[in-house]
A protein has these predicted regions:
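Regulatory extensions appended to serine/threonine kinase catalytic cores
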Residues: 243-267
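Eukaryotic serine/threonine protein kinase catalytic domain
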Residues: 1-243
């Protein structure tokens, strides 16, 4: 944590030792994260302000977000539907923005969804992300097993957006239910549950939430709902802030709207 001398804004400083990068073979991951964070500008994606290279380290100066959705759920348990929907709206619109810029995140989970002081989502950790080319398919198995789509754990080809939809479905389930839909201490058993889509929907969920989860956690990626279709659902649009409604935004307009919603920015 640091403070920008001219603006007084708090920033996060991430220092990565070059020797550690080399020894752990994570150079590609660091380069991808820097590449995508430089490219993406959205109110609910963590901002990268500066990258400084020294002889020994790579220093990333990032927007400060002191919390994370994972800890918030641990502290609060299952969330009221209205609160879960607010987080979900921010996650989905940020993910949709990534997809429009041909970026598949591939590691969406509560631990990678940071929270600022006003409880706004900031999607982070783009180290496993990848660029999607038209007609191209990915095969790399990425992400955390509990949040990974069936086609990912099976090693099948996938285009990208559909695996993020599955992960967002798991995240929504966790927010609404306070537990994972697919969980097992024995990884092979976990993979069977995921590959067969074996999970239950608690009775306390609204019919609309059940329908949405059922359309996101579909084993066949071709039949899985898409993010543009999610954004058309009445449930998704309840109390949707104007700045998240789907229309083209330039970075300058985004930043202005960002200020209006009390999220910290840095000139």
């Amino acid at each position: 944590l640091a403070t920008h001398a001219l603006t007084g804004h708090r920033v996060a400083v991430k220092i990565i030792n070059k020797h550690k990068i080399s020894s752990m073979d994570i150079g590609g991951r660091i380069k991808r994260e820097i590449q995508f964070l430089r490219m993406l500008r959205h109110p609910h994606i963590i901002k990268l302000y500066e990258v400084i290279a020294t002889p020994s380290d790579i220093i990333m100066v990032l927007e400060y977000a002191g919390g994370e959705l994972f800890q918030y759920i641990v502290d609060h348990g299952r969330l009221p539907e209205s609160e879960a929907r607010r987080f979900f709206q921010q996650i989905i619109t940020a993910t949709n923005y990534c997809h429009k810029h041909k970026v598949a995140h591939r590691d969406l989970k509560p631990e990678n969804l940071l929270l600022d002081e006003f409880l706004n989502i900031k999607v982070g950790d783009f180290g496993l992300s990848n660029l999607m080319g038209d007609g191209d398919f990915l095969k790399t198995s990425c992400g955390s097993p509990n949040y990974a789509a069936p086609e990912v754990i099976a090693g099948r080809l996938y285009s990208g957006p559909e695996v993020d939809v599955w992960s967002c479905g798991v995240i929504l389930y966790v927010m609404l239910c306070g537990r994972l839909p697919f969980d097992d201490d024995y990884v092979p058993s976990l993979f069977v549950k995921i590959s067969k889509g074996i999970y239950s929907l608690p009775s306390h969920l609204s019919p609309e939430a059940k329908d949405l989860l059922s359309s996101m956690l579909v084993v066949d990626p071709v039949k899985r709902i898409t993010i543009p279709d999610i954004m058309q659902l009445p449930w998704f649009n309840v109390d949707l802030p104007a700045y998240l409604r789907p229309y083209p935004l330039t970075p300058s307009v985004e930043d202005k709207q960002f200020v209006l919603h009390r999220a910290p920015v840095m000139d």
